[in-house]
From Swiss-Prot:
Name of the protein this chain belongs to: Cbb3-type cytochrome c oxidase subunit CcoP1
Pathway: Energy metabolism; oxidative phosphorylation
Transmembrane segments: 4-24, 56-76
Keyword Iron found: yes
NCBIfam families per record: ccoP
Domain Cytochrome c: 130-209, 220-302
Main location class: membrane
GO-annotated biological processes: oxidative phosphorylation; proton transmembrane transport
Compartments, record wording: Cell inner membrane
Organism: Stutzerimonas stutzeri
Coiled-coil parts of chain: none
Family: Belongs to the CcoP / FixP family.
Length: 311
């Protein structure tokens, strides 16, 4: 801000405060004998306005408000280029400096705790009850909005509490997913295989791979669907529908991991138009130490107690 505008703002602000002080004292009336008997000549419905001075507490409230304003402008920036003299902030208070100060205080308090767990493997951290509680709180703050408070997911968001993992369920894969995120793309096959191909493949996947019954009256050729699957789908999902973690291709021989639904219509929609899912990378926002705890918590959700004990 230029010197002119800084001075203009400071002069206008301070001038307003001085003017308010003058106005309050100039219009103040003191107590006088017989004051309560004098009226202003205003009356309505038997109610008259008396010529009494402002109550003392009210007058002092005005003064206190102006004094508070002056103190605030001394401590905080508010008069042009004036930075304020609030203790603890070199060069004046700003919201960025306050945030940095709070982060530094949090790091000083919790840094040793995070460092302790960062030196342990994810599998070891998953066996520590205190660490798991910390991870659960982090999960509730940062992950539950998509994956649910119970980590069982919802339509379009995977269940993190079962054994079905698109990108791998080992500790390293889970941590990588949280740190770097994942981008999953299921291409649309509607134009390539046609509407009949979509219906046939969907029926084949649901009945022959996942073992789910088809709705009564379903008109589909399972043999033709198997051929189309082998030509267009098996390269990612596997010949037997076992999936491929390297590509994030889900298992098709179990409906447990079908996050977009398992009905015949939902399968057809997925094959026809494809799907695009994204897990945002959290490293920049949470940092390595918090992600380490989160990974341990998520890892613990899909492990039985005896599995954790054998890590």
């Amino acid at each position: 801000m230029s010197t002119f505008w800084s001075g203009y703002i400071a002069l206008l602000t301070l001038g307003t405060i001085v003017a308010l002080f003058w106005l309050i004292f100039a219009t103040r009336k003191g107590e006088s004998a017989g004051t309560t008997d004098q009226t202003m000549g205003h009356a309505f419905d038997g109610i008259e306005e008396y010529d009494n001075p402002l109550p003392r507490w009210w007058f002092l409230l005005f003064i206190g408000t102006l004094v508070f304003g002056i103190l605030y402008l001394v401590l905080y920036p508010g008069l042009g280029n004036w930075k304020g003299v609030l203790p603890g902030y070199e060069g004046g208070w700003t919201q960025e400096k306050q945030w940095e100060r709070e982060v530094a205080q949090a790091d000083e308090k919790y840094g040793p705790i995070f460092a302790k767990y960062a030196a342990m493997s994810v599998e070891e951290v998953a066996q520590d009850p205190q660490a798991v509680k910390m991870g659960a709180r982090l999960f509730a703050n940062y992950c539950s909005i998509c994956h649910g408070s119970d980590a069982k997911g919802s339509l379009g968001f995977p269940n993190l509490a079962d054994q079905d993992w698109r990108w791998g369920g080992d500790a390293a894969s889970i941590k990588t997913s949280i740190l770097n995120g994942r981008i999953a793309a299921m291409p649309a096959w509607g134009q390539a295989i046609g509407e009949e191909g979509v219906k046939n493949v969907a029926a084949f996947v649901r009945k022959d791979l996942a073992g789910l019954p088809l709705p009564e009256g379903t008109d589909a050729d399972l043999s033709a669907g198997k051929n189309v699957y082998a030509q267009t789908c098996a390269v990612c999902h596997g010949q037997g529908g076992e999936g491929m973690a390297a590509l994030g291709a889900p298992k098709l021989n179990s409906a447990a991991g079908w996050i977009y639904g398992s009905s015949l219509g939902q399968l057809q929609q997925t094959i026809r138009h494809g799907r695009n899912g994204q897990m945002p990378a959290q490293q920049q926002y949470l940092g390595d130490d918090k992600v380490h705890l989160l990974a341990a918590y998520v890892y613990s959700l899909s492990q039985k107690p005896e599995q954790l004990a054998n890590q």
